[in-house]
Regions:
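Divalent metal-cofactor coordination and adjacent catalytic microenvironments
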Residues: 1-112
Length: 112
């Protein structure tokens, strides 16, 4: 399912006029995030519309993590939050959103 698009992701990270390289990264990143979320959820049949809205918002966050990670492809990516605290980003862009995704995960399918 298309949880996030390159266009929505670029708007989320506040890139109004992306360079060719930025557009190429966004075009690669959005489907990667979508595929990772789909794989993690297993089956999203039966997710209500409010769940789809939440997953869409989480996908934007994952896009933001992936976007920031681009700045340090061979090292640790981090940023400073509004409180001045350093926040380290995981190499797996959906790790920070997995706890919220668990609400919508088809556990029966995963257990067999």
């Amino acid at each position: 399912m298309e949880w996030v698009t390159a266009t929505d992701g670029l708007a989320f990270v506040r890139v109004a006029s992306p360079s060719a390289a930025e557009q190429a990264w966004a075009d690669a990143l959005a489907p990667a995030i979508n595929a990772a979320i789909d794989r993690y959820l297993g089956s999203y049949l039966g997710i209500p519309s409010d769940g789809e809205a939440e997953i869409g918002a989480l996908a934007l966050r994952a896009f933001g993590y992936g976007w920031k990670y681009r700045e340090a492809p061979f090292g640790e990516a981090s940023y400073v939050d509004q409180a001045g605290q350093s926040v380290r980003l995981a190499g797996d862009w959906i790790v920070p959103i997995k706890p919220a995704l668990n609400r919508w995960r088809d556990m029966g399918q995963l257990l067999g």
